[in-house]
Structures are given as structure tokens and as C-alpha cells.
Swiss-Prot record:
Induction entry: Decreased by elevated free fatty acid levels and aging.
Species assigned in the record: Mus musculus (Mouse)
Residue list for modification Phosphoserine: S425
Signal sequence annotation: 1-28
InterPro entries assigned: AB_hydrolase_4_sf, AB_hydrolase_fold, ABHD4
Catalytic site: D351, H382
Chain coiled-coil ranges: none
Gene inactivation effect: Homozygous knockout mice lacking Abhd15 are fertile and newborn pups exhibit no obvious defects.
Name used for this protein in its record: Protein ABHD15
The organism's place on the tree of life at top rank: Eukaryota
Amino acid sequence: MPPWAAALALLLAALALLLLRPWKRAVGARTSVRDHEEQEVASGGPADQFSDRREALPGGCSLICKPSALAQCLLRALRRSAALEPSPRSWLSGPHLQTFCHFILPVGPGPELAREYLQLADDGLVALDWVIGPCARGRRVTNPGSLPPVLLVIPNAWGRLTRNVLGLCLLALERGYYPVIFHRRGHHGCPLVSPRLQPFGDPSDLKEAVTYIRFRHPAAPLFAVSEGSGSALLLSYLGECGSSSYVTGAACISPVLRCREWFEAGLPWPYERGFLLHQKISLSRYASALEDTVDTGKLFRSGSLREFEETLFCHTKSCPISWDTYWDLNDPLRDVDEAAVPVLCICSADDPVCGPPEHTLPAELFHSNPYFFLLLSHHGGHCGFLRPEPLPAWSHEVILESFRALTEFFRMEERMKGLSRRRTSFLGGRRRWGGLQKREVSPSSNLEEIFNWKRSYTR
């Protein structure tokens, strides 16, 4: 797909948005700006249901989480963060401008990438883009004396590589990380070699990719960041793997958490049309390959994101399933209680794609699960959180600072466990050994039987 085609689609949606007044809120919420501001004043924050266990942060942001030692560590790091300090309001403050700048503006030259194609167990292909440059002169070291951590970045579910994703990779590279971008089957130049695409919340391909990354960097900490609708994939992976996950910490930028309701209610018209057109353009090159699997005529006539998703994954010719069954298998929160990795979700109260937090964010998840943390801001749009150039998006700064805090917290925990083990050994008790990693890395011979990979260099 030509890179200008998706940008043109979203640009047309942006123009339509400027002409369309009023538009409906996502997930069925219709509230005026005035009512929303009155609610904020009355509740002291963006959403009334999040008033419990709310910790104030700079810039009018809040951290909602279950009290714990880890929460206190993260809270201290966020309160020291310069990225959250309030800045003068600019023309970028509006939620739609934040969102459109993120999705529409050209990505620019971007980083230098080394692409690997990973052949999966069913012979499908996914792509891993390793960020190899440019290396800044003043590159910081995140963990002195240890291997550089790997940062796995998962773009949105539509497959569009945005300027913010590339900006995060460049900032992470500058801070001493080794970033790698995961691309699904058929996304961003990854060939679709089998007539099977990845469902919205199916983490099977991501599992194999993470195992391969672990094979390549067995001793390096692994962190993961997802953008927008791509968060469903990351959360599904963390839930299915539980304590066996190789990931040390994760973050989700503007995640879609109530996915089924999000599809069924629909987005504001310009966003719905823009994302739908982008998907149709992306899959049009594979129309002939998909003819034996789905009704491509109906697929490309779809008038909504729900109809497109349902036609592509539910109304298949070989094994059709119901819409209810599809979400039983793909709801990203279906196994959320099994997740054993700290997850920071950064959301905005003015998100025009997800909708207001009181309708789209499950407050009980952050109140009851000690691994989930919600950073809620008043402004930022959808995956925007932009600041005046040349400053990076403040969400990127916050994510990397939170990962640093997690690393220090876990290092201290391991140190305390080590002291306890030595004391037990000195007293003659039974010695117990604990490892930094939850699972042993599979022998290379076994992995080589599963995976085949190719590498090509791109700029």
C-alpha cells in the first residue's frame, strides 16, 4: 500500500470532522464540554468513578491503583517526572488536533531499521523491525553494569506505523534501550503468505515472537509498549501467559479495554470512516488470496468497523463462528486476573476515539488488581499527549521513567531476597534459590526446530 494512501484517508476524515457538528461520542456517550467540565469540578478529576484511590500527580494528572509497595514506588517516580509538569496551552491542546497530528502527519525520515521475518509454526510470517540507529552522541545508560533492555513496541491493530511509535523508538534508543517493532501478518510490508490474519485479541503470533526475542537476548530485561487498539494483543498475551511471561513491565497508550462495546457502539463518523478505509486499502492487495476464506465482496462493502471485523473473522467459509464466540476468544480482559506483570495504562479524559473514561475504562480493574495502574490526564486526545516541538510526547517520557522505577524496584526486591537467603543459609535452614527470570530459556536447538527467520535491512 502506498504510504500516502492511508494518510490521505485520514486527512479526508479530518476534513469531515471539521465540517461535522455535532458528532456523537464513542461508546454511546453524548455529553457536552460544559457538562464534562462541571463533572470534573464536582469530582476533582476526569471521572467520578475514579475518585477512590486517586493519587494526585503534576499537570492535573491522577494515578488510580490498588495500594502496594510497587504502587508507592511508581507514584514517587511519577511525582518527580518533569514530563508531567504543566506547560502553557497551545494550539495542540485540542483532543482532535492531538489525535490527527498523531495519525496523519508524515512520520519523517524515522529511525534506521533492520527487518527480520519470523516464520511461525503454521508457516505464517510476522515481521520484527529492530531499531539500529541513529545512535545519539549523548546516549544514556538505563541500567549501568547490565545488558541494555529490549523494548517491544506493538502498533495499533490497523497496522499503521505512526510518528509517535517511531518517536518512542528513537527516545528509547537514546535512553539505552534496544527497541523492536512487532508487525502482524500482512501489516506494514509483511507478506501475507497464508490466508490467515491475526484476530483482534489472539496472542499466539506474539507469543512466538516474544520467545524468539528471548532467544536472541536471553539475559536482557524485556519491556513492552502498545498503542491504542494494539493494546488488546499485549493484554491478551499477558493474561494467557500469566507468571510465565518473559515481560518485566508493560505500558498501554490509550488502550481500548472494552473492545466489544467499542466495536458495537461505533466511533465518531470521521474516525470510523478513516480507520475503515485504511483497513480496506491495506487488505485490497490480498483480495484474491482471501477469496477462498471470506466473502471479499461483502468485506470491502462493509460500512462499519464491526461489520468489517465480523465478516473477516466470524463469517469465514471454512469455520464460521458467532460474534459472541469471537469475543469469548478475543476479549483482552478475559484472563486479566492471571496477569502477573505491572501494566501502566495512560489514558486521556478527552479521548475522541475511545470516549470518556467513565464509559470505556473498567474502574474495578485498577481498584482491585495490584498489577494494573491507570494514569489519567485531562488532555491528550487518542495516543497524542503531544508537546511543542522538539519535545517528545510526554507519554513516552513517563513510560520510560516508569520502566526505570520498576527496574530499581525489582532489583531492590532481589537484593532483599538475597539477604534473606544468605541469612537462612547461615542459620542452617534450607536454602532456596530464586532466579530473576520466571522461565528458563528453551535450548537453541529446540527453537531452531520451530523457527525459521530471514533478515533484510531497510532505512
